[in-house]
Amino acid sequence: LTMSNNWISAALMSRINPQDFLRTLRDFGINTYGIYPSIVLCLGPNEASVSEMVSAYSTFANHGIHTSPLFVTKIEDSDGNVVANFQPRMNEVISEESAYKMLDMLMSVIDQGTGGRIRYKYKLDCPMGGKTGTTNRNSDAWFMGFTPSLVSGCWVGGEDRDIHFDSMRMGQGATMALPIWAYYMKKVFADRSLGYDPKEKFDIPEGFNSCVSEDDVDAGYSL
């Protein structure tokens, strides 16, 4: 995961029922309508919106609990009286320990992997994790990133699938999407009124073991 070695994802997928994997995607907030359960799903051949991806990644930062996106939290009348309040739907998708295992791997993407320029080029040294993404023919460049309190993402591409970058060097997520996310996070941390603390740390589950056992893989807990 740190270096985007997709063959590892393919090896894991060969040990997981594609139908079960599809159910897991739904649990994480990905719209799976029209997606055929196939082993190639691990390589991301189907489309997903930035909103869906942010929703999915928030599960890792939120201790394994998925929170459905909510764009309106309350409605007030012209006098300031609250007409209605809305609460997001939440459900536990994976255990807190499994969520932190994913966090641990995604943090290594930034600390020593494909997202390394977050540190050495953009000088963001706070606790954070992320993942770069690049599709075939360099048509899409992705970067999903998160801190303990904020999950966000960036996609660079075109609605027309024939639009693509000329080369992997220019079209990869680390080159096209990551810089946008990095500048955005710099703005977020610079604006103290937003209340995001760059020194905030991720909560480590009590008794956390960073090793993934064979039983975890067979049971699908490492998803």
Where are the model-predicted features located?
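Active-site-adjacent helix/loop patches that line small-molecule binding or acyl-intermediate pockets
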Residues: L1-N62, S108
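A penicillin-recognizing enzyme superfamily signal
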Residues: T2-M3, S49-S222
